[in-house]
Amino acid sequence: MVRGNHDDPSYFNKEKIKHERCRTIPDYSIIQACGHNILCIGGAVSIDRNYRKKHDAKYHLSGTASYWADEMPYYDEAILNEIGKQIRIDTVITHTAPSFCELISKNGLSGWTALDPAIPADCEIDRKTMDLIYKHLKADRHPVHHWYYGHFHQSWNSEINGILFSMLDIMEFKELRSSNPAS
């Protein structure tokens, strides 16, 4: 599983869930499956973070939380450089997406922005971080053909610059077919 914005980062950084077919993985992990090299990076901005913080303070007196300050994705040039020396990435799975992918409309933010004026700027940083990752992979000539993400709770697909970007809705699945025709 890739870390979402409503997920406790420690479950992923410490790989607390490790089952045969389901596990939490740290950001910048590489999964090799069906002949693909898949880069996984989680995180995104929670537009409802003020609500979550107030709710946690009122109802989660034991210290449990539903918001984490380190929820956003981060760009790590050193890790991407090291990955580029070792392996070629053909598929990317992230929680959010580059700025040129849907969801581009900011219509749903106005109510949340009234409660948290930093939301628009943080959403911009969030998407620009994905832009940096995209540009790094392109500049390093990784043969990326697929990029999957969720976060926006909608479905959308489009090919952009030779990459099929797929935004997945809640409980939507996509099959990444084997890159080996004999399989």
How would you name each of these model-derived features?
Residues V2-N13, I31, S46-Y51, P98-L103, ...:
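Active-site environment of divalent metal-dependent phosphoester hydrolases
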Residues D27, G43, L168-I170:
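Active-site donor-binding loop signature of nucleotide-sugar glycosyltransferases
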Residues K14-I17, K53-H55, K106-L109, N161-L164:
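Short, glycine/charged-enriched secondary-structure capping and boundary segments
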